[in-house]
Amino acid sequence: GTRIDLSAMPPEGVMRCRAAWSRLSGRPTSVVHGNPANPGNVRITTDRVALIDWDEAHVDKSDLDLVLPHNAAGLDSASHDIAAQASAAWEAAVCWKDDYAVRRLAEVRAVAKPSISGTL
């Protein structure tokens, strides 16, 4: 995927992002647009559909471009959830310190801490 500098993000945020991205392991890779859900990036004519504004394009997991409003791409619910979490993490990471990024990170579930059990 895209190389992102996570040094400005708080450590807990970095862990949440990395955990969200790791859930995409094994999914197909392709060139992704990076922002297909923005209606301003779609141009439709009677016989064609096109995406414009490819400045965020990169090679990554295909599911990232399939997180569309109302699950328009028809992903199964588990795949949609995984992709939505990873997408929110990516958006938070690429523009950290921006209010939008902070809101997107809030959508990424916290990493579950392992419980320690046993007897002494």
What are these regions (language model features)?
Residues 2, 16, 62, 85-88:
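N-terminal alpha-helical segment
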Residues 67, 74-120:
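Helix-rich C-terminal or lid/interface subdomains of diverse kinases
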